[in-house]
A protein has these predicted regions:
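A structural signal for well-ordered alpha-helical segments within the folded catalytic domains
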Residues: 29, 33, 56, 80-84, ...
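Short loop/turn motifs at secondary-structure junctions
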Residues: 15, 94-97, 180
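N-terminal glycine-/serine-/threonine-rich beta1-alpha1-beta2 phosphate-ribose binding loop
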Residues: 1-44, 53-72
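Residues embedded in well-ordered beta-strands within globular domains across many folds
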Residues: 20, 99-102, 129, 185
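Rossmann-like dinucleotide-binding domain that binds NAD(P)(H)
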Residues: 126-190
Length: 190
C-alpha cells in the first residue's frame, strides 16, 4: 500500500472511494469534511467532534453529501462478551425499567512539567499539529498522550466517555432519537 505524510494526497486519488480516519482527534472533522467534499465515503473513529461548532460543520457536510456513507466507529459495540451482552439484557427488560444511567470514567493521567524536546526527524510536527494552536514539541504531546491535551482532544471524556455514553444510549434505544444527555458536568452525564 502507498503511504502518505499528507492526507490530501489520498483525497486526490480517483481510485479511492472510501477513507478511514484514524488520526489524532483534532484532525477528525477537518479530514472528514474534506473527504466528503472529495466525494469519498467516510469511516471515522470516535470521538467524532470536540466542539459544538465541529458538530454543526459535520452535520452540514453530511446533509450536503447525503449520497455518501458516513460512519463513526467505536470498538465496544463489537465486544460480544461484555457490551453487547449488557445491551441485550437492558433491551430485553432483564434489569427492569431503567430510570437513570450514570456513566463513570476515571481521571486523565497527570504529570509534568514536560520538557521541550527536539522533534524526531521522522515526524512533521507542523503537519501533526494541523489546525491546532502551534506549540513547541514535547514528547508527551503526541502519539498516545495527545488525548490529555485539550488542543488535540477532550481528555478522558472524549477518549472513554464516548464509548460508555454510546453503550448507554444504545442500550436505551436512544441512538436514533433526537434526545441526548439532559445534563453534563465534569463527573456525570444523565
Amino acid at each position: 500500500a502507498d503511504a502518505y505524510g499528507d492526507y490530501r494526497k489520498v483525497l486526490e486519488r480517483k481510485d479511492i472511494d472510501t477513507v478511514s480516519i484514524v488520526t489524532p482527534d483534532h484532525w477528525h472533522i477537518k479530514i472528514a469534511v474534506e473527504a466528503l467534499e472529495a466525494g469519498k465515503h467516510v469511516f471515522v473513529q470516535k470521538p467524532l467532534t470536540l466542539t459544538l461548532e465541529e458538530n454543526q460543520l459535520i452535520r452540514r457536510a453530511c446533509e450536503k453529501h447525503s449520497n455518501l456513507a458516513f460512519l463513526v466507529g467505536t470498538q465496544q459495540r463489537s465486544d460480544r462478551n461484555k457490551f453487547m451482552r449488557a445491551v441485550n439484557m437492558v433491551q430485553k427488560g432483564l434489569l427492569g425499567d431503567i430510570k437513570h444511567v450514570t456513566v463513570g470514567i476515571n481521571g486523565s493521567p497527570t504529570g509534568g512539567p514536560f520538557p521541550i524536546a527536539d522533534v524526531p526527524k521522522e515526524l512533521d510536527w507542523e503537519m501533526w499539529q494541523g489546525q491546532a494552536p502551534a506549540k513547541e514539541y514535547r514528547e508527551k504531546r503526541c502519539h498516545y498522550q495527545f488525548r490529555w491535551w485539550y488542543e488535540y482532544s477532550g481528555g478522558k471524556f472524549t477518549d472513554w466517555g464516548a464509548h460508555h455514553v454510546d453503550i448507554a444510549m444504545w442500550a436505551l434505544n436512544k441512538n436514533g432519537a433526537k434526545q441526548g444527555p439532559t445534563a453534563v458536568d465534569g463527573t456525570n452525564c444523565t
